[in-house]
Structures are given as C-alpha cells and as structure tokens.
Regions:
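N-terminal catalytic or cofactor-binding beta/alpha core of small enzyme domains
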Residues: 1-205
Length: 205
C-alpha cells in the first residue's frame, strides 16, 4: 500500500531537492520514456530510461527518490500518477514506455501495457540480445486505462518491469547503490545494448 495516494499529495508532504527530484527532457518527440519510480525507489530504472531516451532522441521523464533510506515511501502507483509534467509528455506522445523495477532473483523483463504492437516488437528485440522476456503477471500488467503509460494519443503504452537481478546486470560491478548507479563508467554494455534494442523496436512500430 502506497504511503501517498497521489503525486500531488506526495509533493505537498515532502521536499523537492531533499526527498526527490525530477529530471525531464522534452525533445519534441512522439515517443516518451518514463522512470516513474526512479533514483533509489526502483534502482537502475532512471539510468536505463535515460539511456534509452538518449539513444533514440526521445522525451524523458524520471522522478528520482533521493533519500539515503526509505525511498520506497515515495512510490505512487501508476494509476494515481498525476504529475503534470509527466502527464503532458505522455498525452503529447504516440508511444510511451515506462521502465519499472520488481523483485526477482532471476534475470527477467516482464512486459505489459496496452500497446500490443510495440509489446510484440520489444519482446522480439530484447530476446534477440539474450534477455528473457515474459508476459507480466496481472498485478504488474500495466493494462489499466488510467495507468499513465496508456494515456497516449493512441491510448496505449508499454510497461516494462525488470527484476532486481536484471537491473544489477546493467552495472559492471553488479551493484546498484546510488554511487554505483550514477557512475557512468560502471554502466555495463548491457545498458547500451538494451537501449539500442528498445530503439530498434520503437522505430519498427
């Protein structure tokens, strides 16, 4: 159960620059890449979303938990995600991909959302580089109409849930603490291969 029922409530009761920060790059693209629970909330999602967006010259949004501990309290579920910056980007996009993190000791990317064509293409593209992709279970399926990822101009997006193990593999030393995440020299080739695979899929959609 989330501590805050919306991003509006979260922002009223926490402090920007201390508890959290927002990174946003509007590149006037028809594609937006999101890390809604970035920074220390779901580690490695910010870094991967940033890399994908940079690779494809897409719009980018990340809400980053900055606390030394307790970042999980800053998690607001995607169906209650009323951050205006993120909403504006998604509503102006034809394709949106949200990068999330989930539990799991196995290296897996669970895929969901309502953009069936892009789901198919991303699955194929990620499997081509050796990533295990599975259909997301119901509780992380990302198919709800009011999930922010699905409020695009086409009423559909893609939600990718990466297990903790897969996210660790994005870093050379397999550690995802803030110091290790923010050191780009520690980013594994998989980070860039993943981003390139995503770009290839999006360009085919």
């Amino acid at each position: 159960m989330d501590k805050f029922k919306s991003m509006t409530e979260l922002k009223e009761l926490t402090k920007e620059g201390k508890d959290w920060e927002i990174e946003c790059e509007n590149r006037s693209s028809i594609v937006t890449i999101l890390a809604l629970h970035g920074g220390g909330i779901e580690p490695a999602t910010t870094e991967l979303a940033y890399t994908i967006a940079h690779c494809g010259d897409y719009n980018y949004f990340s809400f980053k938990g900055m606390r030394s501990k307790g970042n999980n309290e800053l998690h607001v579920t995607s169906t209650h995600y009323d951050d205006q910056i993120a909403l504006d980007l998604v509503r102006g996009s034809q394709r949106t991909v949200a990068i999330h993190g989930c539990e799991g000791n196995e290296s897996v990317a669970y895929i969901g959302g309502s953009d069936d064509r892009l789901i198919e293409l991303i699955t194929e593209s990620l499997e081509d580089i050796g990533i295990s992709v599975r259909e997301a279970p119901h509780h992380i399926s990302g198919t709800q109409e009011n999930n922010i990822v699905n409020i695009t101009q086409t009423q559909g997006g893609v939600q990718l849930e990466l297990t903790a193990q897969l996210r660790k593999e994005l870093f050379k030393n397999r550690k995802s603490s803030r110091k290790n995440r923010e050191n780009k020299d520690n980013w594994d080739d998989l980070m860039y291969d993943f981003a390139d695979a995503m770009k290839k899929a999006i360009e085919r959609a």
